[in-house]
Each structure stands twice: as C-alpha cells, then as structure tokens.
Design a protein with these regions (language model features):
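Short beta-strand/loop motif that positions the catalytic acidic residue
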Residues: 167, 173-175, 179
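Catalytic histidine-centered segment of alpha/beta-hydrolase-like enzymes
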Residues: 205-218
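Gly/Ala-rich beta-loop-alpha elbow adjacent to hydrolase catalytic centers
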Residues: 66-70, 74
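Conserved acidic catalytic loop of the alpha/beta-hydrolase fold
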Residues: 45-62
Length: 222
C-alpha cells in the first residue's frame, strides 16, 4: 500500500507533518503553486495533476488521503478513476465546499504586507504545537494569499453531492468536532452516502485536526 497525502487550499505537504513521520514510505504532495509553479484553477485540474504525479512514479495500491480541498481531489479521483486507487481517506472535507465570503475577501484584500490574511492563517493553526507552528506560518507566507484565493474559488465551485453515492472504494471519513470551515455535518453526509464508509469525529479538533490531534488521526488511519 502507498499512502499519498494531498493538502488543502493554500496549504502544503507540511499539513501532514506528523503523518509523514509516522507512516513509513508515505508521500505528501505539494500541489503546483504551493509554493513553486503555477496553481491549477479547478479541482478537476488538480485531480489530473495528482493523477499524473502518482502514475509517473508508478505508485501501486494507492490510498489517497486528502484534507479539505485535498479531500475534494480524492473524491473526484475515486469517482473518475476508481481502478487506480485502493481506497480514500477524507479529512475535514465535504461533497460540496461552498466558501464563506469572509475567507474569500480576506484573500482578495490581504492588507498591507498581507497582515489581514496572516491573521487568518494564525487562527487556522492556533491549536498546533509550537514545534511546527512557525514552520507552517513561514510556508504560508511563501504560498501567499493569491494562491489561497485561487484554491478557495476552486473549492467554491466543487460539488459532487449528486455523484458521491457512486464511490465504491473503501473510504474513511473524519473531522474535528470543532471544525467551522467544514463542519461535522459535512462528514456525516459523506458517511451516509458512501457505502460502508468509516466515520470518526475527533473530539476537540478543528479544521487542521491532523496536526492538532495527530495521534488520534494516525490511529484512525492505521
């Protein structure tokens, strides 16, 4: 089995820092534009890029684990190319990812020296341990608000609510109980529509539950 992690909007492979340390031979992808290269403008575009990445490396028995936007990519992969995956793991995501205008506006008008946008990034990572917090913030500044906006706009257009029941791969769905961006009802919906999906709500976790409650998340992945 090859465990491949895909990060969320404006993120990077560092979103799975603790998972990479725990799961031997796993891989976390940096999507284009995060921070190098040009970002894709749609979830479909990111899907094809990820597919190209995994097939070029001849990964076999891939279990694709996606967080937030990465979860959207994983869902679409499972719907479009199910024979290429062994299973999917969805963390803090949904079958539809409508984005609150506050998040979009903060990216579009990030303030002088991106100060307004950076305040939002700090809020995202407030539950993360200090050993990784500063590293995450540095990477955020490298990715920047323009790429974050691009990704959130792609998420805002994502909607597979009419298709999600067609996923036939082994699926695990989890989220933090305090997640505001992708609330528990999103995870419950996925669990109700995907046949035999395993569902877990991690008590006390928020949107970056895999960083905040990494031991519990790793136990669930195992």
């Amino acid at each position: 089995m090859k465990l491949v992690f895909v990060h969320g909007a404006g993120g990077s492979s560092l979103s799975f820092y603790y998972q990479l340390r725990h799961f031997r031979n796993s891989k976390a992808i940096d999507l284009p534009g995060h921070p190098t290269g040009k970002p894709c403008v749609s979830i479909e575009g990111y899907l094809e890029w990820v597919r190209g990445f995994t097939t070029a490396r001849r990964y076999k028995d891939v279990v694709l684990c996606g967080h937030s936007m990465g979860g959207a990519i994983a869902q679409l992969y499972a719907l479009r190319y199910p024979d290429e995956l062994r299973g999917i793991i969805l963390i803090g995501t949904g079958a539809r990812l409508r984005v609150n205008d506050d998040y979009l506006n903060r990216c579009a008008s990030p303030g002088e020296d991106n100060a307004v946008w950076m305040d939002g990034q700090r809020d995202y990572y407030q539950g993360v341990e200090s050993d990784i917090y500063q590293v995450l913030m540095r990477r955020s500044t490298e990715v920047g608000p323009a790429v974050d906006l691009n990704d959130l706009q792609a998420c805002d257009k994502f909607d597979v609510m009419d298709e999600i029941q067609n996923i036939g791969l082994p699926t695990q769905v989890m989220c933090g109980s305090e997640d505001i961006m992708t609330p528990v009802k999103y995870t419950e919906y996925l669990g109700s529509k995907i046949k035999d999906a395993r569902v877990q709500v991690i008590a006390g976790g928020s949107h970056y539950v895999q960083l905040e409650q990494y031991q519990k998340v790793n136990e669930q992945i195992e």
